Amino acid sequence: MIYQIIHSVLSTVGVSLNAFMMYLALTKSPKIMRPCSAIITIKTGTDILASIMSFFVMQRVITDGSSIIVIPTGPCTNFGKTACYVGHMLMLCFLEYNLIWMISSYIFRYYILYVRDPPIKHLVFVAFCLSIPSMVHMAAWFSFYDSNETTEDLSSYGIGSGEMALGGEVVYWSAITLITQLFITAFLVVVAYIWIRETLCSFAVKMGSVKKDVKNLNKRLVKVINFQVFLPSFIFLGVITFASMFTSKISYEYAQYAISVIFMFSPICSPFSYILFVPHYRNVIIGKKKQPKPHPEMCGPIRSNTRTTSISVTNNSSHLSSAH
């Protein structure tokens, strides 16, 4: 019962924070931040779905290396084993897609800085294309799952005959596959973070002291990605907990509850990377309506005014010559 309450609270907080962040991105972003708002909206949408699936299943995971047992305790139990297995797989799928989108957002930031603003329809199209492999992968596992497959005797784990439990070869290999993919994708996020951080720093060095606002922009970007790189640590910790239980390094009594709870902190903490370090959103929250001095937004392209200034000076000189 306590575990279900904790899960309900975490899922509610995850949905609420990400829904609020989505609201800010959709309604409080200036025109220059439209690409950024689209990136944030897609990410928060994925976090919301992950939180909903976590609440739907409220799973515990037990393994001794030879088998993996998923014990759902959420609303999915009212719809049968197949619904719980689908919810279990979708939760892991959304967590993985969230990490993939983080990598994509780093690439988009590079593109925005050095090339131009990508159209929003292109961002949506890329997000859709990135989801196709995961959806095909999930559909394959769903087709293999047999809800009538018998599980081993679970009395040694303190699980009564009346409790729903998901087990068997499909559950075993699908869990192993997805958890391994989560670990690899989280590692790739760290690699992408190192790359984009070096890119932002080198961009600031190239600009030198010509544009002070550019330095402020890059400082904000670095703060955002410094916070975001902390998010995969929850995935790492959850996977390490699972691996430790899988290899019998730790007992299942507490580890079975820890894995899903640890995973949930990734979507919960994600909105704070924007709320804390993007001035426009932060000012909306604290009720600050005006900025004393305009600054370029963190996701907008850097525009140089040098050419415009030179044209204006040339035109003015021409008018003066005509007057004389």
Curated annotation (Swiss-Prot):
GO cellular component, one term: membrane
Residue intervals passing through the bilayer: 5-25, 38-58, 83-103, 124-144, 176-196, 227-247, 258-278
Region of interest (Disordered), residue spans: 290-324
Keywords: Membrane, Transmembrane, Transmembrane helix
Keyword Transmembrane: yes
UniProt subcellular location: Membrane
Compositionally biased intervals (Polar residues): 303-324
Tagged with keyword Oxidoreductase: no
InterPro entries: 7TM_GPCR_serpentine_rcpt_Srd (IPR019421), Nematode_rcpt-like_delta (IPR050920)
Superkingdom as given in the UniProt entry: Eukaryota
A UniProt-annotated Pfam family: 7TM_GPCR_Srd
Bilayer disposition of the protein: Multi-pass membrane protein
Recorded family membership: Belongs to the nematode receptor-like protein srd family.
Protein name: Serpentine receptor class delta-30
Organism listed in the record: Caenorhabditis elegans
